[in-house]
Amino acid sequence: MAADAGPGRKMRIKKSTRHAKITGDFGEMAVLYWLSKYGFECALVDHTGIDIIARNPHTNEIMGISVKSRSRTEEQEDEYVSIPNDNFDKAEKACAAFGCIPYFAIVVDAGETIRGFILPMAKVLTLFPKGKAGSGWKMTEPYLARYAADPAIQVFAFQTTTMRWWGQEVVAADAHASRD
């Protein structure tokens, strides 16, 4: 993944050895934050199959959410998110134990955009039925447009900019001054 380093320049991003774990934690917290920001009572849970339990203030349903997070390099930005078949079974069992409806949240950091999608597990399986090993959440532009148009899929996104990073000016400061 390369960050914008100004006109015609790219800053190479080198991920840490624990980046996958950190990405997973970040995805869980981003979803938790977004839910809380919009009035959902919610909590992180350490349980096989789900990561978050939330009460939806719009429907009053209790959601058991399994969060899948990925950080993509520049070459992988359109790559699908693989969801192994056993993840669906584990989410279903956990939700049965807690009396909640199974949901999935998919968080992908790709390029300058971090995208999040929250939807019922049943909708994931309708869009992308289980294959031999699992399901694949597609991340190409046509699919992103379909998700944004689908009222059953909640979508949020962060646009990211690294302005300066350890002595390397990435984006000129005056490029952001006009936003104020």
Question: Which residue ranges define each predicted feature?
Answer:
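Mixed-charge (Asp/Glu-Lys/Arg
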Residues: 1-48, 55-180
